[in-house]
Regions:
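Short, positively charged
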Residues: 1-104, 108-109, 113-380
């Protein structure tokens, strides 16, 4: 069940629009009483209100924050009622109570659907395969930005990194050590056989492996565990190679080749009819995203799946590698308004360099939002 703030954000708008269309006299102060709020909601909202009833049944008063949500709901309801010319024939349902549905609509007022959740347009923390599937309609289960798109350069990056590690040990008496204040120890050292041992100790438990001085990427991946890669090898890189020119040059070369290959794949296989619309919060039916603050009310029209291809397109997909960070920049444009949104996917390891599969975390460039590419209905 959603929290009380989310429920109030949705049902306050639905209730007040309903009171207005039914011409029921009320004061905003009456809605500050949970019992009266519930009574009014039951009068004007059709369908199931179980979550609202459960949420309000056990409280005697609203907090100041909850009262502010109701006040903002009142402002938004007034705009919706007037702008969309709501009349008595329009049925109001609270769709936010339906946890099984796929679309983002929270309240339905006649033929108009509204999404009111504050997190309706949050960014994505996705695996690379999810990004590719969203853009192309592919069905990958996993994808590695470096191994799958620039394996030769990825192997070279590892070799350069390993070479710098060996050079460090040769220059510092054959050992590197990092002790954590919580009692863990990460150690690299040259053993009696002139091989390199990786060791990680925590809570009196030690994990270790031995690697040859001439170590390849396949051998490294086969012989090491996630702990040894993340807690030893990656810690060494962070502490000693962040400004190393050889390391950074190899990493940048790999990032550039990989992102150029990925951008090419995305552009050549772009599929507007599959997962991409859902990725952009486009669904079968047109709906409106609405939000209100103490300062203003904003309502945006989100096109239907059928209208989508005529209104919104991906203008470009490009490789972008500042310093050595592997990025994909996607520019989306509304063809009617000319407004553009740039999305940045940062392809990076989340648990240390060369450890696991990199993610493709998505960010908006220049403080953007998906709302930029939708049509303004109200912004006051």
């Amino acid at each position: 069940m959603a929290d009380i703030k989310t429920i109030l954000r949705e049902t306050s708008v639905a209730t007040i629009v309903g009171l207005k269309k039914e011409e029921i006299e009320y004061t905003i102060e009456e809605l500050y009483n949970p019992s009266l709020f519930l009574q009014y909601a039951k009068q004007v909202i059709s369908g199931e209100l179980g979550s609202l009833n459960d949420s309000l049944d056990s409280i005697n008063s609203f907090s100041n924050e909850e009262i502010n949500i109701i006040n903002n709901g009142n402002k938004l309801a007034d705009v919706i009622f007037q702008k969309f010319q709501i009349d008595k024939e329009d049925t109001i349902t609270w769709e936010g109570n339906n946890v099984g549905k796929e679309d983002p609509i929270d309240i339905q007022i006649g033929k108009f659907g509204f999404s009111l959740k504050e997190d309706s347009f949050i960014l994505e923390n996705m695996g690379l395969y999810q990004l590719i599937n969203s853009f192309t309609g592919s069905s990958y289960k996993t994808r590695h930005i470096f191994k799958d798109y620039a394996y030769k350069e990825y192997s070279e990056w590892f070799s350069k990194t390993w070479g710098e590690l060996v050079s460090y040990l040769n220059n510092y008496n054959g050992e590197w050590r990092l002790d954590n204040s919580k009692g863990s120890s990460s150690i690299l050292f040259v053993n009696s056989n002139n091989d390199i041992k990786l060791s990680y100790t925590k809570n009196n438990s030690t994990r270790e492996c031995v690697l040859p001085k001439q170590c390849s990427l396949p051998v490294f991946e086969k012989e090491t565990t996630s702990d040894l890669r993340g807690k030893v090898f990656s810690k060494f890189i962070n502490q000693n190679l962040k400004k190393n020119e050889i390391y950074e040059a190899a990493k940048k070369k790999c990032a550039k080749v990989a992102t150029e290959a990925l951008a090419k794949e995305l552009k050549e296989n772009l599929n507007y009819s599959d997962f991409l619309p859902r990725f952009l919060r486009i669904h079968k039916m047109e709906y409106y995203y609405a939000k209100t603050t103490n300062a203003n009310v904003e309502i945006y029209r989100v096109p239907s799946l059928k209208e989508f291809v005529n209104e919104i397109e991906i203008e470009s997909i490009e490789s972008h590698v500042p310093k050595s960070q592997a990025n994909i920049l996607t520019t989306i444009i509304n063809k009617h308004t000319g407004r553009k949104l740039v999305l940045r996917n940062e392809c990076r390891f989340s648990h240390g360099q060369f450890n696991g599969t990199p993610e493709a975390k998505m960010y908006y460039e220049n403080n953007g939002s998906l709302l930029v590419i939708y049509q303004d209905v109200v912004n006051s």
